[in-house]
Every structure is written in C-alpha cells, then in structure tokens.
Amino acid sequence: MNRNHHDHLDAAGKDMWSRLSDLADKADMLYEREGISKDRKSVSEEEEEKKTRFSILVDLVGRLCDQEERRTLGSSPTKTNTLFEGSEKSHLDHHLDHLPQKPRSSLECFFTRVYTRRNHNNVSTSSSLFNTDEFERTETKSPTIRNSQSSPSSCLMENTKRKRYQSSGKSKKPKFDPFSLTAARETPEWLLDVMRKMKGAEGPIKLIYEKTLTATDVKPSESRLLIPFNKLLRNDFLTPEESRAIAIDKEEEEEDTKKIGVKTIIVNQFSKEWSLRFLIWVMKKKKSGNGTLYYTLNRGWNGVVSGNKLKANDNISLWTFRCGGVLCFALEKE
C-alpha cells in the first residue's frame, strides 16, 4: 500500500505541511494578481521573472526552516527578509513560522509540482525551473590598464562617411571562433608593461590574428599587411564609428578609390611605436571579377617590417587595445 511522504507526521506536523500548501496557493494568487502587467511582457521575460521569484521563494523557505531548527536547538534566531510587503507579508510570515523542517530539495520539488500544475503555458519541469546556472554566467575579461586620464587629443582618429559594403545583395561577414584555444591565450607580460608606459592606454586586450609571414607581406613595394576576414580569431575589436569609417560601398569598389581608413598605432615589446592606417581592402579575382575582403595595415608598414626585422616565415601575433579610445595594435614576433 502506497504511503504519502508525510503520513508519518503527527497532527501538528500535518498541520504544518497543510500551511505550506497554503503558502504555495498564496504565491500563486499573487502571480495571478499581476497577470495584467505580465501580459505586456514577452514570454521569455515572464518566464525569467517566474524562475527568479520562485527560486528566491524556495531559498526563503529553506532558510526559515533552518531558523526553526536553530530555535528548536536553542540557538539565537537570525533575521530573514521576505519577498512581500504589507498585509500579505504578515499573512505569509504567520505560515512560514510554522513550516515543517523539510530538506530544500523536497521544497523545490513541491513548488515545481505546484507551479507546473498551474502553468497555463504547460512549461515542463525538465526545463530546470530552479537552475540558477542560467542566471550566473561569467565572462573572462582582459586586464585593464589605467595610468592616466584618457585624452581624446592624444590619439586621433579620422572618420569618413561610408556606406556599408554590399556584394550581390549579401554582406560578407568575417568568420572566427571565439572559443578557440588560440584566442584564449593569456596577455603577454611585455604588452602590459608597454601599456603602463603609454598615456591613456587601456583594455580590453584582444588577440585577433596570427600569421606566418609570406614574401609579399615583407616586400617593400607592397608596403601592407593583409588580414583575411576568414582568418581572424575574433572580429569584435572595432567601434561602430570605426566600422563606418573603413566601410566601402559598391561605387567605391568599382572606381578603385584610394581609401583613407582610420589612423592607428602599432607597438612592439620595446615600446617603439609606428603610425599606420587601418582599412578594408578588396582583392578582385581576374577571371570572375569577384572581390575578397581583407583588413589591411598600410602607410607605414615598411617601417614596421624594418624596425622589427621581419622576414618571410616569421610567426607574428596581433593584439588590440585602446589609447585614448583609439585602436592600437601590439605586434608580437615569435
């Protein structure tokens, strides 16, 4: 013969369990009372709010059960805040003070059953109503270097009005893997030291590109470093203003107009700096006439090559950071 999990309780215990049920009903009534305001919210917002409030309610009940146990053992009680105010607060406190000492996992199961039974959207309990991992997402950030007040005049950027580049009605987006092990490399200590010496240098610091240099990359007559979109480790290092400044439209592509781009700075591990231009370059194929998009560093790249003694087959890495809000690159030669 099946028995309910509270059949072993005496009359007082059953009464306490009954009051717990009343508490759940009361919580459900409060949600129904707020139905009009919730109708104005999206389904996702409504569900997130329900998850959060039910999670807090379960935690509250668990803490009050702990408080009841401490009081029974003779320990001094601790003050516990509730979710509700006014008459509803006093009514709920009356029931909460007599809750049975059930494990929190049982309380969670109980509230999940009550919530599911009354949920008009038929939300399954398998959606992990009380999974707090959904609300505790962390993000690893690069170190931020702040030695002095950032000055917009210390690092200048030239903006030009451009249209968004389009090819055959489709925009070509850079491909990158934000979760690659390469992109997760730690910031080199030398870069942090260089940034401390720069006025207005700050993070976030991002590793965006790695390459084995070709003969063309170090050829003086070319005087530029091409960075293919699909070889980027990440493409979130530009501000909206910078993206507009380096963008090109169809007319500019056909006219092969010289692009201005944005002014940028490259530094090496010896704190030496070079001023360059950063822009988008279109490499057209002779047969098809289709263009491939690249980022490019030019108008000073030869100085970077000679100053760092770069040659073909050298492995380099490019990191980005900010100087007074302006895009800067750090060149690491391996």
Swiss-Prot record:
Keyword tags: DNA-binding, Nucleus, Transcription, Transcription regulation
Region (Disordered), start-end ranges: 69-89, 133-178
Molecular-function annotations in GO: DNA binding
Biased composition (Basic residues): 161-173
Cellular compartments annotated: Nucleus
Annotated Pfam families: At2g31720-like
Biased composition range(s): Polar residues: 73-84, 141-157
DNA-binding region: 229-334
InterPro entries listed in its UniProt record: At2g31720-like, B3_DNA-bd, DNA-bd_pseudobarrel_sf
Keyword Cell wall biogenesis/degradation belongs to the record: no
Disulfide feature: none
Keyword DNA-binding: yes
Protein name: Putative B3 domain-containing protein At3g49610
GO cellular component annotations of the record: nucleus
Stored PANTHER family: B3 DOMAIN PLANT PROTEIN-RELATED, TF-B3 DOMAIN-CONTAINING PROTEIN
